[in-house]
């Protein structure tokens, strides 16, 4: 059995595509860089306007159509949003239950690039996020954060350790 995942920025997502995705894709990655000001700064259209207002309702509809399962809102944190725990909380406030956020990869000369001196702040944000998640869980508003979902019995990368990597056993590009 092959598992298929698709990643989308949501711009062209419509009812027909959503139906296809729900029928054919095991998982969907919905790319949203963060809060409105963060996303729109990093993902403007050619005319300079942001994509946030267009894509968020589409993503909410898709997440609901999948019963809040088998998808991830996937954000990116940069030097512009080292307070990325606020982006995750924003996603939760929008009703999303499956989330991930990754550090940007870029040349160190890029103004948004993460620098070595940012690492302590990033570590603080992960601690802050863990505490916020505990509070949300107590309030009955819990959600999953991909990078905190570790198999304590098998470790995070058993398949990769056994095969040398996830390539060919977990994913193809």
Regions found by a protein language model. Name each.
Residues 28-29, 56-59:
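A conserved non-catalytic segment of reverse transcriptases
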Residues 1-36:
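Conserved SAM/AdoMet-binding glycine-rich loop
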